[in-house]
Each structure stands twice: as structure tokens, then as C-alpha cells.
Amino acid sequence: MYHSSSQKRHWTFASEEQLARLRADANRKFKCKAVANGKVLPNDPVFLEPHEELTLCKYYEKRLLEFCSVFKPAMPRSVVGTACMYFKRFYLNNSVMEYHPRIIMLTCAFLACKVDEFNVSSPQFVGNLRESPLGQERALEQILEYELLLIQQLNFHLIVHNPYRPFEGFLIDIKTRYPMLENPEILRKTADDFLSRIALTDAYLLYTPSQIALTAILSSASRAGITMESYLSESLMLKENRTCLSQLLDIMKSMRNLVKKYEPPRSDEVAVLKQKLERCHSSDLALNAVTKKRKGYEDDDYVSKKPKQEEEEWTDDDLVDSL
């Protein structure tokens, strides 16, 4: 259960400000480590600032979600959600300048398949990469090399509670105990869209899965012109607890605001930041702590098998929708 889980105890935070402090601290610690090795000065322009790291994390997180969306065989949503949560957690306490998000995102997806018992072999997994057989072999080597590191940085807290199960539970409850809404299934598509959008925000690190699921349903109802506050007050028995009801409504409002204010990284900004990132990981600087024993990816041209022709803003190394 979520309320007795490591997710609640260790990976659910009080505010966006707390998340920002953790990320800034990870950035500062890496800079101190890099300066200590004598290869760079404290104010060297090679360093990424915390807000630049966050932009890159957003970019690679979106690519992770898109990679999972075109994965063959189809990847269950719970696996996608788990991979996304691993990625968010990892970069709360680590810098992209030390561990490249390109390989971390794949390692997150690979580990999520194992933990959620999605039966995919290693060759099947890397077979989803737009790479030659040799490139796929190298990718698998790096994934396996980073897997233990990822597990350690997650503090061995591998069970993730996603909002998808409580979402289905709420729909069943509405069908059973809320006759005012004749066909709750009409809410599903818009609610699914909301869950997809909120996965790109920090909501998974701030709110409970059931709060996210309920917000998705009520947001969908609101967009359809359906008022469901009586479901909260009557069916969920919050009528007598106005304080709890008010707090829940505030939480849902905060989540909707997270979705509204989310801005995807601009392609021109990402291009500049990726150049800085590759500079941090170049062999002459060697800022990253993990010694690369094997050759890994030298670019991002690996994420699916067919380029998406209709989106001109994507370059040929971007994640694409295929099939």
C-alpha cells in the first residue's frame, strides 16, 4: 500500500521549492568534485546551471516517454510510469554532467521492465533502438553497466505506486456508487490525456497516486461540463469534513496549475545545452566519475526505427513516433 511505502516515506516531497533545492545541491556537489580534480575552475563556462540541467532532464524525460510509447511489444502504462519515476528520482540527487541522461533513461526503462515483470529479453529491448546490431550490443553493455548504479541511487526503493490502478478504481466506484453520472467511461480519454501531461511535471514527486488519479477524473469531468463535487462530498464521505475537502480541492487546483505552466524545452535551447553537456562528458575533461570501460552512444540517434517526417522541428537524432 502507498501509505506504508518507501515512495511515501522517501520520495514524496513537501514542495516544488524542496525539489529545486535538491537539484541545486546535486549541481553544486558535482561542480565541487570537478573543481577538486583540477581540470576546471569554479566558474568555468563548461558547467551547466541547475535550470539548464532541469531543461535537459525535461527533454530526455520526454524522449523516454516517447521511446516507451513506440516500444514493441507494447509496454504497459505501469512500466512507463515506473521508468519515468526512476528517472525523476535519479536526477534529484545526481547531475547530468556526471551521468549522461541518454543512457540513464534507457537504464530506467530496462530496470522498470524487470521490476514490473514485463517479460522482455535484453535483445528484444535493445532491438527497439534505431541502431546497428553492433550499436545495440554496445547499448546493452552500457545499460547493464549502469543498472546497479541506478538501483543504488534509488536507495533500492524499486516499487513505484502509479496513478493508473487508483484511476481504474475510481472509475469502478463511480459506476457503482454515483448514479448521477450514467456513463463514466466518457471521462476516460480526457483523463488519460491529463495523466500523460502530468507525467511530464513533478506531480509524481509531490502528490499521492490517488490524488493524481482523482484530479484526472474531475478535470475530465470539468472539461465535459460535468460537476462532480457531490461525488467528493457524498460518495467519498467528505461532506462532514470540510477541512479535508478544502485541502483536496486545493491539491487538485495545484496539480492543474502544474500542467498549465509546464513548458516543453525549446529545440534551440536544447541544442545549445546538449553541446555543453557533451563537452562535460568529453574525454579531455572527463568530469564524470564513472570511468567508461566500453564505448557508448556518441549521439542520440537511437530511439526508434523510422524518422517522423511530418515534424520538421525534430532533427534526425530526435526521438520519433514510428510505425
Curated annotation (Swiss-Prot):
For this record, an example GO cellular component is: cyclin-dependent protein kinase holoenzyme complex
Record localization: Nucleus
Q: Which GO terms describe its molecular function?
A: cyclin-dependent protein serine/threonine kinase activity; cyclin-dependent protein serine/threonine kinase regulator activity; kinase activity; RNA polymerase II general transcription initiation factor activity
Q: What does this protein do?
A: Regulates CDK7, the catalytic subunit of the CDK-activating kinase (CAK) enzymatic complex. CAK activates the cyclin-associated kinases CDK1, CDK2, CDK4 and CDK6 by threonine phosphorylation. CAK complexed to the core-TFIIH basal transcription factor activates RNA polymerase II by serine phosphorylation of the repetitive C-terminal domain (CTD) of its large subunit (POLR2A), allowing its escape from the promoter and elongation of the transcripts. Involved in cell cycle control and in RNA transcription by RNA polymerase II. Its expression and activity are constant throughout the cell cycle.
Positions carrying Phosphoserine are 5, 132, 304, 322
Transmembrane region(s): none
According to the UniProt entry, which residue ranges have a biased composition of type Acidic residues?
A: 310-323
Protein name, please?
Cyclin-H
